[in-house]
Amino acid sequence: MAAESALQVVEKLQARLAANPDPKKLLKYLKKLSILPITVDILVETGVGKTVNSFRKHEQVGNFARDLVAQWKKLVPVERNSEAEDQDFEKNNSRKRPRDALQREEELEGNYQESWKPSGSRSYSPEHRQKKHKKLSEPERPHKVAHSHEKRDERKRCHKVSPPYSSDPESSDYGHVQSPPPSSPHQMYTDLSRSPEEDQEPIISHQKPGKVHSNTFQDRLGVSHLGEQGKGAVSHHKQHRSSHKEKHPADAREDEKISAVSREKSHKASSKEESRRLLSGDSAKEKLPSSVVKKDKDREGSSLKKKFSPALDVASDNHFKKPKHKDSEKAKSDKNKQSVDGVDSGRGTGDPLPKAKEKVPNHLKAQEGKVRTNADGKSAGPLHPKAEETDVDDEFERPTMSFESYLSYDQPRKKKKKVVKTSSTALGEKGLKKKDSKSTSKNLNSAQKLPKVNENKSEKLQPAGAEPTRPRKVPTDVLPALPDIPLPAIHANYRPLPSLELIPSFQPKRKAFSSPQEEEEAGFTGRRMNSKMQVYSGSKCAYLPKMMTLHQQCIRVLKNNIDSIFEVGGVPYSVLEPVLERCTPDQLYRIEECNHVLIEETDQLWKVHCHRDFKEERPEEYESWREMYLRLQDAREQRLRLLTNNIRSAHANKPKGRQAKMAFVNSVAKPPRDVRRRQEKFGTGGAAVPEKVRIKPAPYTTGSSHVPASNSSSNFHSSPEELAYDGPSTSSAHLAPVASSSVSYDPRKPAVKKIAPMMAKTIKAFKNRFSRR
């Protein structure tokens, strides 16, 4: 119930985070999320980690969101990854440690000893070295006698099976603490010096007082490199112990082999206590037996905290993680170089080199035996602290590799970049080995072997990192490959290229409507179609879906120019058949008249025309379809001519109805208005005016004065007797304008300028207005 309620609360807070952009509200919701008991299942189901991680660049709540994501990263289990990484690491490191690796360390001692001896001697006193020896030897004594015989039998039994160049679990553990499994050759080199050093811890008490400067140099390096990798101080202890390995007498080798396993157990126990102290935050005073051990562990814990505390803050931010990782890689490589040189700072003249060669395989065999026994499950006790140590180290060193899967980030990209780093460090290691080989002639063979080992290692690591990146390249090839059509050979007979496979994809678009009726219905009905409404916007551009043959091109030209075909010569009917099928009956008849040879072949074409124009007619006996069509066509034309003649004769014999008659036949017609205005303007209307107006005698003056004028105007060609005739006349309304017009057209009087009607109206209004005042 509690898990379900927490899941519901997380979902509600996640929804509020996505909906509310207020910084105060966001901070409030993030604080509530930090209080809730979040589990890995809740993170996977809700995806709240991705939501909170999206606020890491926010101005107000960015720091709190990064801290919360870093806190949730600790919840993610990395046991599976750590076990798989340990196995991969051991496989990569196997058969890569030559027996004469210790010889190179001894050669480097002399060059580095003189430069560091004065500075190292003033750091600590011999008592401090003795305290360190006590601190390292006290936890080992209870285990020394109990496990000596058992581990010796296991070592003998596994010595028969294991190869001479196998990797030890202790070195692989420490190598895993410092870096991820695809480690660099510098780390491999430091592990070589680390593996035999762990078996030589009790020998420090038997060393001479003259070797104090190596202890002080190691202590000074442990203090100066607190900001470096978490295992800096422990690795310097081991390097210091390896510097005195050659000084030990030959008769103490058996004691060293017996006490090697007990010391490894003590180191694992101390590392287990250190990891628990880092996780729980408890003090180290309850865990360790002596006060000197407390001080040393506190110093190591502070160095680890200084390193891992910024690493957790930076791990949530991918942009800042990569530069810091590069800086740590550079610092680690520099420290490894110093440690390799610093191992030889306190070395004097000891046993010859063959003794060192004998010791290296023995320690490797003993530790290989321990690996085999752990794999068989015989020693479950020592395996448990190592698993816890790898879990703790993975939690601090590589939290993003497992937590990013919950945030749906991409992992192969980081693996690819790590491979590049290992290859670059491999080149630097190769250069270092070549310098060492030039310094002495004894180590020439070993210097030639190590670059080969490094090359093999880089070749193994690069495929391991390149394999996860291969699926990223597959989706990029989205474009389909074009068909690889080879160019045809040039021949006299031309053949076109085959049509592409992409052409059929255009055909469904062209055949959207199978008939004009469907297209018309789709365009003008009320229902919607999947495609747009077909609207005619001009003829579309004609295109050829494929290359046409020469024969097809010629037939196409002939179909488009049938009216230009006359004599075809000796061209057979089979060639012209597609063209003749497109001909109308008139065009076909004309071509046959020009080419009588085709008449025998075109009977089927005339049959088609007969069925189309004369559906119910059948040919007579011994009559071809062509003859039938011509006969029926002539009969139809004759009927049409007869019908036309009948209609024409019917219209000719029809009685005429109303006829149009001219008005003013016996009088002068009134000219149109525009003509009259032009006549008045230019004085061209005087031709109709008589030259001399004759006035009737006095008896007729008593009547209308307009009558003689009208008579004279209408009969100006008549004699004076006719003027005396007082016959019927038209109305006076018509005569008055005629008389006035005759008077106005008098050329003896000047033409009066007529005022426009609108102007006359305006002038009249002005006169009436001014007259009232």
Swiss-Prot record:
InterPro entries referenced in this protein's UniProt entry, alphabetically: Elongin-A_domain (IPR051870), F-box_dom (IPR001810), RNA_pol_II_trans_fac_SIII_A (IPR010684), TFIIS/CRSP70_N_sub (IPR003617), TFIIS/LEDGF_dom_sf (IPR035441), TFIIS_N (IPR017923)
UniProt KW Kinase keyword: no
UniProt entry keywords in alphabetical sequence: Acetylation, Nucleus, Phosphoprotein, Transcription, Transcription regulation
Organism: Mus musculus
Modification N6-acetyllysine, positions: 430
SMART domains: TFS2N
Protein name as annotated: Elongin-A
Composition skew (Low complexity), residue ranges: 162-174, 704-718
Recorded name of the encoding gene: Eloa
Region BC-box, annotated ranges: 549-558
GO CC aspect terms: elongin complex; site of DNA damage
Function: SIII, also known as elongin, is a general transcription elongation factor that increases the RNA polymerase II transcription elongation past template-encoded arresting sites. Subunit A is transcriptionally active and its transcription activity is strongly enhanced by binding to the dimeric complex of the SIII regulatory subunits B and C (elongin BC complex).
A UniProt-annotated Pfam family: Med26
Main location: nucleus
